[in-house]
Design a protein with these regions (language model features):
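A beta-strand edge to alpha-helix "cap/lid" segment located at domain peripheries
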Residues: 1-21, 28-124
């Protein structure tokens, strides 16, 4: 779970290359209300556009992780928090529940291969 926390901290830096490094080349992102984004190039376009939104920030925290016996595949349940400014300039915060699938690559680095989320109520 620590690599997901570290990745969340990287997202706060705004360094696009560092952020994109967390996804595998063949990753699939499934944002709410959109068709699946296939591959790192499509994910890059989505992330780049999000980062340009006024006041945009995102962070997430793993809730649980389940690793396959093989040790090279895992899934996480996570919560995210996204903030941006609406058309009037008011700051709006939304919350999401997230399922991510991770695969260990040939260098032993965990990479996100499936990233899917939808809306959640605010934390209590």
């Amino acid at each position: 779970m620590q690599f997901s926390r570290d990745w969340s901290r990287l997202a706060a830096t705004g360094n696009l290359d560092s952020i994109l490094n967390g996804w595998a080349e063949d990753a699939v992102m499934m944002p709410p209300g959109l068709p699946p984004l296939q591959g790192k190039d499509a994910i890059k376009q989505y992330v780049e556009a999000a980062m340009k939104l006024p006041g945009f920030t995102i962070s997430w925290e793993p809730v649980s992780v389940h690793v396959a016996r093989s040790g090279d595949l895992a899934y996480m349940i996570e919560r995210n928090t996204t903030t941006l400014k609406d058309s009037t300039g008011k700051q709006v915060t939304t919350y999401g529940k997230v399922v991510t699938v991770w695969r260990k690559d040939s260098t032993g680095t965990w990479r996100n291969v499936v990233d899917m989320w939808n809306d959640a109520p605010p934390p209590s």
